[in-house]
Amino acid sequence: MLDKLATERRNEQTMHLDEMSIEERLTIMNAEDHKVPQVIQEQLPVITQVVERVIASFRKGGRLIYIGAGTSGRLGILDAAECVPTFGVSPNQVIGLIAGGERALIQAVEGAEDSKELAVTDLKALHLTAEDTVVGIAASGRTPYVVGGLDYARELGATTASISCNRDAVISRHADYPIEVETGPEVLTGSTRLKAGTAQKLVLNMISTTSMIGVGKVYQNLMVDVQPTNEKLEVRAKRMIAEATGVDMEMAARYFASSKGHVKTAIVMILADVSYEEAVKRLERANGFVREAL
């Protein structure tokens, strides 16, 4: 079964990889990576459908849950973790599950990815509901842990999607919205942390970012729900206030303070010329969308 997968085949362009110069190896890796955005483009229609379902889940109080093993699981956890500071959401709104749990983030957990039951246990621990969207991630497209998770999610009526890097993947038959980004043979045979991992990360970026835009977490192209948890982010937050409203940095800093460090509230205060309390009310009525609050 594995030897028939494109991601497991030998790459004809790299049969003499060990004999190449460093620059030659880097050049061919770069050339192979350039193929990834092209194959993702072919999947944009189904990625669009997935985003629409995630937005619908969020609006109903549901969550986006990634589930995967190995590199795929780590990428899901990475994307989920970044949503908290970037969009100011609860850690419970976007969640990443990896076969074998936290220990699997830094070392292999033998047999974990081969257990469908383990995925069910992990999802039950999250109290999965029909309002959630579950995205199964597997470069091979056949990981039992992911299949088990998708099947359980469908039983509960949750929306399911899959991201694989092979055509006609097994997990595609277990998901409502299968995304198949066929990345082909790797530079290093079978090392799907390379092109396949890059493709998965790009698709996850698309899903989480555009879903958050769909629920009001972005104004213009600014991440106005950012959590300014360090000096760099605080400076960025003040700059966003200035850029969105046209005020200088000194004025932006004053509004940053009076808005209790909340960028979108400061923007509404300035552009609508209202108090902090009124800006908060407007944003609540507008479900967090700055344009509608103005």
Swiss-Prot record:
Q: SUPFAM superfamilies of this UniProt entry?
A: SIS domain
Q: Note the CDD domains from the entry.
A: SIS_Etherase
Could you cite one Gene Ontology molecular function of this protein? ether hydrolase activity
Q: Which UniProt keywords apply?
A: Carbohydrate metabolism, Lyase
E.C. designation(s): 4.2.1.126
State its role.
Specifically catalyzes the cleavage of the D-lactyl ether substituent of MurNAc 6-phosphate, producing GlcNAc 6-phosphate and D-lactate.
Protein name as it appears in the record? N-acetylmuramic acid 6-phosphate etherase
Q: Which source organism does the UniProt entry give? A: Exiguobacterium sp. (strain ATCC BAA-1283 / AT1b)
